[in-house]
């Protein structure tokens, strides 16, 4: 017996949509949504395909997701070609199965079932889909959100289909995410011969006490919703490769994943004060990829928890851990934002897979969320 959720997931996996190439995935989704009365607006920017679709009017629940995937890696190490979906022992294998073509299929099938049962639903059901989430994310959801905000588009609730679950579908729901701030720092010295250090100024030696103090800072202790802010050095480079040359510069890149206890400006001020304390000559460049956001208990969180409890008989954990997602952009619209999706154990890995029963369950959960908020 065929299942529409699994069939649509397989059709999407067959399209090798390496970010930001959509490879025809959105055309497939748009066709299905238009068939049930959705108005679809293409919102492409540069090399990225996006669309905003809606049906009905009033209080708005949007489902958000991305059609792009990360590269599959060595295809020979997959049990089957990564873009040829295969089911083995109840598991659907293929790049994007869990992140996040399975969620997209579950959303669309849930919408089809919902509209069939509630053709005159009282609220507005919407979709925000992009092909640029896995790579730069410069021309995807962020640009769509900016365009929607510019025309005062209404968005009350948003369900992002990122793979939030750990062991069983719905055991973890993300009701927020930490902020992400990256510092690209260059410490300037004077290049010279290692035998004549008095004629040079070693930026590595200069920077060492600063870096030692930086990594020892306890930025905050977190709060009931967020873990403590984390700072990690990601890259550090200096030198010419020769053992007799004192380098002229040291480059270090470090990233903060920060809670709502801090702002990006507070972090910047503390780092700059530390640089001045150590009397370093430097240039610095900051990249804020997202502010922290939190959706407290309310109608959306309650609807999601209810759907999970109804179909999986478990109470989901509400967490804000993990990396960033497009939810950080959508939260700017003032919407309640929650992430609910499949188990994330194999995302971005060789042999990415998802339990087919989980996708069927996810579609039912999504439909129940629609019924609670916009029926």
Swiss-Prot record:
GO biological process, any: lysine biosynthetic process via diaminopimelate
Cofactor: binding comment: Binds 2 Zn(2+) or Co(2+) ions per subunit.
One protein family per Pfam: M20_dimer
Pathways involved: Amino-acid biosynthesis; L-lysine biosynthesis via DAP pathway; LL-2,6-diaminopimelate from (S)-tetrahydrodipicolinate (succinylase route): step 3/3
Superkingdom of the source species: Bacteria
Transmembrane segments: none
Alphabetized Gene3D superfamilies for the sequence: Zn peptidases
EC class name: hydrolase
Keyword Metal-binding tagged: yes
PROSITE patterns according to UniProt: ARGE_DAPE_CPG2_1 (PS00758), ARGE_DAPE_CPG2_2 (PS00759)
Zinc recorded as keyword: yes
Active site per UniProt: 68, 133
Residues involved in Zn(2+) 2 binding: 99, 134, 348
Binding-site residues, Zn(2+) 1: 66, 99, 162
GO molecular function: acetylornithine deacetylase activity; cobalt ion binding; succinyl-diaminopimelate desuccinylase activity; zinc ion binding
Cysteine disulfide links: none
Family of the protein in this entry: Belongs to the peptidase M20A family. DapE subfamily.
Subunit relationships: Homodimer.
Protein name according to UniProt: Succinyl-diaminopimelate desuccinylase
